[in-house]
Amino acid sequence: MDLPGPIHDFLLVFLELGLILGSLGVVFLPNPIYSAFSLGLVLFCISLFYILLNSYFVAAAQLLIYVGAINVLIIFAVMFMNGSEYYKDFYLWTVGDGVTSMVCTSLFISLITTIPDTSWYGIIWTTKSNQIIEKDLISNSQQIGIHLVTDFFLPFELISIILLVALIGAIAIARQ
């Protein structure tokens, strides 16, 4: 989206605030329904980030798949659960929480130190040199496929990792 600088910055700050407040709501709200709605806000803000980055297809996929399907499924599942189960054995801090926070903090620190040292410019040029010329493609689905593995490789991989985590979480919940 080609916007003037101040408007783009304002929208970026507005989306960041929505993302931060929504993610804090997911973590800290005691009612699972409110947490699910906060998750919907987070996923909606992520799709708006993709629109600001001129990646409209990924934004539409994010909106349809995550907000429209996954979040509605989570809300549907939470509504069928017994609400009193959540408050029976409520501890503020457990050993598992400490281990999880240490693992997440170490992963965050390693990503923060690794990402600035990565040569993203070289990665972009290697994908551009292997790119198929779009005018030779027959259908739009082939063009979308080429864009997903070249121009939108990083968002595509992040979405696939999020789907994998959701699948593993669903399996873990189903086994209990």
Swiss-Prot record:
Q: Please provide, alphabetically and separated by semicolons, the GO molecular function terms listed in this UniProt record.
A: NADH dehydrogenase (ubiquinone) activity; quinone binding
> Which purpose does this protein serve, as stated in its record?
NDH shuttles electrons from NAD(P)H:plastoquinone, via FMN and iron-sulfur (Fe-S) centers, to quinones in the photosynthetic chain and possibly in a chloroplast respiratory chain. The immediate electron acceptor for the enzyme in this species is believed to be plastoquinone. Couples the redox reaction to proton translocation, and thus conserves the redox energy in a proton gradient.
- So which domain of life are we looking at? Eukaryota
Protein family per UniProt:
Belongs to the complex I subunit 6 family.
Keyword set includes Manganese: no
* Record has Chloroplast as a keyword: yes
EC number(s) reported in the record? 7.1.1.-
Transmembrane stretches, by residue range?
A: 10-30, 33-53, 61-81, 92-112, 153-173
Membrane-topology descriptor: Multi-pass membrane protein
The primary location reported for this protein is: plastid
What keywords sit in the KW lines? Chloroplast, Membrane, NAD, NADP, Plastid, Plastoquinone, Quinone, Thylakoid, Translocase, Transmembrane, Transmembrane helix, Transport
Which reaction(s) are listed as its catalytic activity?
Answer: a plastoquinone + NADH + (n+1) H(+)(in) = a plastoquinol + NAD(+) + n H(+)(out); a plastoquinone + NADPH + (n+1) H(+)(in) = a plastoquinol + NADP(+) + n H(+)(out)
The record's subcellular locations are: Plastid, Chloroplast thylakoid membrane
Disulphide bonds annotated for this chain are: none
The name of this protein is: NAD(P)H-quinone oxidoreductase subunit 6, chloroplastic
Q: How does it assemble?
A: NDH is composed of at least 16 different subunits, 5 of which are encoded in the nucleus.
Q: Which GO terms describe its cellular component?
A: chloroplast thylakoid membrane
**Which residue stretches, if any, does this entry annotate as coiled coil?**
none
- The gene behind this protein is ndhG
